[in-house]
C-alpha cells in the first residue's frame, strides 16, 4: 500500500530534504465529503471546483476527496476574509465574477492537519486577483503566483507557486507534482518559498482523440508535507492542465509534409506507369 510523502530539511544551509514514505500513485477510494462520489487518481487531499449550468447557472460545484469531514471556505476578490460554506455548491450571488478560491480543511486519525485548495474562474467584470493571492491565511498552503484564465495551464508551460505557513514563505520545502497520467516530479522551494513548476508533456494519445483535442484536460496536484512545531501538515493545490499547443502545430506540419511528399512523388509514379 502506497504511503504519504513526508519532506524534512536535513540541513537548513543546504536546503535539502528526504523522503520518508513511498509514492501515492495507486488509486484510492473517494471519501464522502462531497455529495457526489467519484473515483480519484491520488491519495492526496483533493479539491475540485467546476462552474455549473442549468438551474444554478453561474454557480460552482465543489468536490472533495481524501478529506475526512472537511470544512469548506470560499474566498473571492470582493471578499477575501473568507466565507464558510454549509454545502458543496456556491451560487453566483455568493461567488461574484472573476477568480474564486476554495479551501477545505480536515484531519487524519494520526492528527495530521489536511488542507486542499483550488480555484475557479467565472466570466464577468475583470478584477485583479492579486489581493486574493496575497491574503494571509492560517496554516500550510501552496499558492500560485498568478492565476490562469482563458488559456489555462498547458503541457511544457512554467508556473511559479509559493509555499506559505500562516502567510509567511517556507524555504527548503519539498513540493511534489503528481499528474493524472502518473507523472511525478519534485522541487525544493527557494528562499522566498517559491518553486517554478514545468508541466510535463504526458497526455496519452487516447486522451487527445476527437475533433477538440486541444480542449482535452487532465488533473494535477501539488503537495507539500511538513512537520512544524511538533505538528504534521499535508496541504495540496489541485487544478487541470491542457495539451501543448505545439501538438496542434505538429499535427498540421505532419499533414502538410505528407501532402508535399505526395505531390513530389506523383511525377515519379506517373513515369513508372508510362514505362510499364
Positions of the model-derived regions?
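Glycine-centered loop-to-beta-strand initiation motif
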Residues: 80-90, 94, 185-206
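Beta-strand-rich domain onsets/edges
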Residues: 26-50, 116-171, 238, 243-246
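N-terminal pre-first-transmembrane soluble regions of secretory-pathway and organelle membrane proteins
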Residues: 1-107
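Short amphipathic beta-strand segments in non-cytosolic proteins
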Residues: 72-77, 143-147, 174-188
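Juxtamembrane amphipathic/hinge helix adjacent to a transmembrane helix
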Residues: 221-246
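C-terminal single-pass membrane-anchor helix
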Residues: 2-10, 18, 239-276
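Solvent-exposed strand-loop boundary residues in beta-sheet-rich modules
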Residues: 167, 179-181, 228-230
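Short, aromatic- and glycine-rich surface loops/edge beta-strands on solvent-exposed regions
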Residues: 86-121, 206-228
Amino acid at each position: 500500500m502506497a504511503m504519504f510523502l513526508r519532506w524534512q530539511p536535513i540541513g537548513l544551509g543546504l536546503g535539502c530534504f528526504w523522503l520518508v514514505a513511498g509514492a501515492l500513485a495507486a488509486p484510492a477510494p473517494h471519501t464522502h465529503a462531497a455529495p457526489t462520489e467519484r473515483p480519484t487518481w491520488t491519495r492526496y487531499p483533493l479539491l475540485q471546483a467546476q462552474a455549473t449550468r442549468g438551474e444554478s447557472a453561474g454557480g460552482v460545484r465543489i468536490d472533495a476527496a481524501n478529506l475526512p469531514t472537511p470544512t469548506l471556505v470560499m474566498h473571492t476578490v470582493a471578499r477575501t476574509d473568507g466565507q464558510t460554506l454549509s454545502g458543496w455548491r456556491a451560487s453566483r450571488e455568493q461567488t461574484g465574477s472573476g477568480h474564486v478560491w476554495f479551501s477545505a480543511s480536515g484531519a487524519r486519525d494520526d492528527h495530521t492537519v489536511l488542507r486542499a485548495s483550488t480555484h475557479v474562474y467565472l466570466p464577468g467584470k475583470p478584477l485583479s486577483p492579486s489581493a486574493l493571492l496575497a491574503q494571509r491565511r492560517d496554516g500550510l498552503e501552496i499558492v500560485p503566483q498568478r492565476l490562469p484564465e482563458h488559456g489555462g495551464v498547458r503541457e511544457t508551460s512554467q508556473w511559479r507557486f509559493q509555499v506559505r505557513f500562516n502567510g509567511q514563505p517556507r524555504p527548503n520545502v519539498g513540493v511534489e507534482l503528481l499528474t493524472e497520467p502518473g507523472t511525478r516530479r519534485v522541487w525544493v522551494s527557494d528562499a522566498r518559498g517559491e518553486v517554478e513548476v514545468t508541466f510535463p508533456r504526458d497526455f496519452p494519445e487516447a486522451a487527445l482523440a476527437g475533433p477538440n483535442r486541444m480542449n482535452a484536460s487532465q488533473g494535477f496536484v501539488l503537495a507539500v508535507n511538513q512537520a512544524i512545531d511538533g505538528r504534521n501538515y499535508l496541504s495540496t493545490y489541485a487544478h487541470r492542465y491542457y495539451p501543448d499547443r505545439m501538438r496542434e502545430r505538429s499535427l498540421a506540419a505532419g499533414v502538410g509534409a505528407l501532402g508535399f511528399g505526395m505531390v513530389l512523388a506523383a511525377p515519379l509514379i506517373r513515369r513508372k506507369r508510362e514505362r510499364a
